[in-house]
Amino acid sequence: RADILLNSSHSDDDQLFFAGLLPYYASRGCDIQVVYYTDHKNETRRRHELLNGLWTVGIKYYPVISNFPDYYSETIEGALKTIATEGYTENDALGFQVEMLRRFKPQVAVSHDFNGEYGHGMHKLNAAMMKRAVEISGDKSFFPETAEKYGVYTPKKLYVHLYGENKIVMDYDTPSEFFGGKTPFEMSKLGFAEHKSQQGTWFKSWMLGKNGEITKASQIKKYSPCEYGLYFTSVGVDVNKNDMLENITLYSEQERI
């Protein structure tokens, strides 16, 4: 059971393109489940890095990691070809998403940009399958095995990174007492620093600036980690447009009431 489920394509995307999200909602006492859509079994140290990053930003629960391989592609078709090299199909890619929604019953699901941020095929496949999963996860005729195991379930909301409709802008630059005065974005920077193998990539300068000049999430304009669109809702559209939990009551609060 999770208030928020984030399906990150790779082991550092949760700290990069979703920078600020995990520490922000962790600081608010949310139950958060992180899922990784690819498994870096060809570079096993990244599994350790992802755990160190999650613990740094306040996540309490172990993630779920799929068995889908990680290879670069630029299209959904290309991504499907990469997972096919290990015997997986489009149906498997969709079924995994449906299973995660039914298993963890998130009130809010969060997905990658439909265009894959910088164009990565696995980001695109992840987002496309999440969209379809939200549409069918409440129907027991789809993937009946997981329907029988977990029951059917439809999230109350789906937010898609950079989606152009029903836009919200998150504030990750306000200091948090939960993190000793650091902002959620600053915590994600510390989380990304745990990904030692990725410090020589262009992602570091994208997040920090070439000379460390980026100190706020709001300074990042390309693939902004602050911008999302509400793709699906069963609890009404957002009015304040700055909080994924607008119109949502945390599971813990529901139990208290």
Spans of features found by a protein language model:
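Metal-dependent de-N-acetylase/amidase catalytic core
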Residues: 1-7, 90-257
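Active-site beta-strand->loop->alpha-helix modules in alpha/beta enzyme cores, enriched
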Residues: 1-143, 257
